[in-house]
Structures are given as structure tokens and as C-alpha cells.
Amino acid sequence: MASEALHQVGDGEEAVLKKENFNMMNALDQLPKPFPNPKSMNRTVTTKGLPLSSKGNLVNFLEDDTINLPKPMPVDDSDCSSDDTSISAFSSTLLNPIKLAVTQPNSSFFAGMLEGELNKLSFSPMAKNTEKEDLALGPCPCPSKCQMATRGLLDLDNPELETETSSTHSESSVVVDLPDTPFIFEHTVSNSTAVISWTYALGKQPVSFYQVLLQEAAETQENELPKAKNRPWIFNKILGTTVKLMELKPNTCYCLTVRAANTAGVGKWCKPYKFATLATDFSSFPENNPIQITVRRKEPQRKIVSIGLEEMRRLEDLEYLFPY
């Protein structure tokens, strides 16, 4: 009897322990799970373009030289990665399927940015002195513009601020002009990707970032400007001079233009650069070894020719001897 009673007591303790373990497991399951480490997550380093108005085309945007960016739409955090550098967070269903990857900026780009910052620092004592004098004389005649300029980059959506050539009234001694127009000199295409590179003018006006405008173009003749087929897509705040466009349509012509921006505003768009993707023909070449084509061009050099008085007299004599 005693052994039987002990056996029953042991079974009861074992049942109590099992019940406590089961309750503990349920409590652990109900606790909120921690968010996974963002460093271990797979992130995309691509930029999605922002659609512009369907009424305009690339030629109209280049003539007007103004772009009104639409306001961002509220979406969930899961629709957009934290590394997405697009202008605003749009739903993936409304975005153009074309993606853009920005390569690491070259050393000359960083050198230009550093030179611009050093120029600002060198003129900072002079700016402070002039600012004290202006405050002693009276208030700023244009407070709205001064407040906007002290925040750094100007608002590109406001056309009134695009033509400003100085940051504040007190910094009038430091003249910052608009950046030069970029020149696209190379592109490499395949059936679905395109790598576009343009030049950066070292030693001239500093550049804060670039804007890229892409649009599918219709076929035109040699001397004709590329006609817009669909509405353009803009990629903003690009730090670098080389971009890679992905998920393009095979055997399709595209038109691309670039402009630079700095503290003075935005520069002019470069001439439309036309390129075409290759056709997808798996019978002519294997799928795992696609063909790529690279095209390079040189920027035309301007030469200045000076003619003296003697050369002018010789030309006049030749014109007299050999009239038209």
C-alpha cells in the first residue's frame, strides 16, 4: 500500500510539472517576437523613378525647364525599403517597372564637393562681419528668401528660387553660379539593362546631386529630335556620374537627359541622349552569356582662332585676287 501511495504521489508531481512546462511554453509564444536585425535582412539598393504628368513629354520638359513633382502618397512601411533613395514612397503597383542603381561616386565628384565646402568656410568670417553690419542697419529686405536659403539646398519645386545666384544677402560676396550642363559620353546596353555615364566638370561650379529624366522614345529620322512615346520618369538626388537602368524592355529605344543641381539651383538639361536595348533572341546567342554593346563619344572641343593685322591683309589680298 505504501509503495502504491508513493507511486500515485509521484505521478501527481510529474503531472504538475508537465502542466507548468506547458503553461510556460504558451506564455513564451504569446510574447511579442523581436524585430529581426536590419543588418541581416536583404536590402535593395535600387531607386525607383517617379512618374510625371502624362500630358507632357521629354521635349516639352526640356523647353519649359521646370518639373512639378507630385506629392507623395501615404503607404505602409513594408512597401518601401529603408535604403530606397527615391523621391517619395509610392506603391509598387503605381511605379514604373524600370529600376535604377547608382554606382559609387568617383573621386573627382567628391573633390568637387569638398572644394565647394572649403570655399564656403573660407568666406565664413567675411559673411559674419557683413551680417553684423546688415543687422545694425536694419532688417533683411527679403526675409522669406533669406530664411529659405539658410536651410541649405533650395526647393527645386519652387520656380522663384531656381534663379537665385547667392545664398543670402549677407553672403553676396560669395557668388555661386548654376552648375554646368553634363555631357553623356558612354553607355553599355544589353537586352534589359543600360549603364549610362556622364562627365563632371572638375574645378568649376560644385554639384550637390544630379537628376535623370528617362522616357521611352519613338523611332525618328537622323536629324529629328526623339519623340516622346510615354510619360517621362525622373530619378532625383543621384550622387554619382554613372547609373544602371534595369528591367528595360528588349529591342526598345529610350531617351535620357541629365541635369545638375547645387545651392544656387538647378542647371540646364543636357541634350536628349538616345539609346536602344538589344533584342532577345536566344537562338543566336546563349541565355547565360548575353551580348553587351558599349558606345563611347567625345565632347566637341571649342577652339579660339586669333587673326592679326597681317593675316587680315593677306586674306583681303587673296579675296581681291580670287573673288567669289
UniProtKB/Swiss-Prot annotation:
Annotated Fibronectin type-III domain residues: 179-280
GO CC, any one term: nucleus
Pfam families listed in its UniProt record: fn3 (PF00041)
UniProt-listed SMART domains: FN3 (SM00060)
Domain of life of the source: Eukaryota
InterPro entries per the UniProt record, alphabetical: FN3_dom, FN3_sf, Ig-like_fold
Identification of the protein by name: Fibronectin type III domain-containing protein 8
Lineage of producing organism: Eukaryota, Metazoa, Chordata, Craniata, Vertebrata
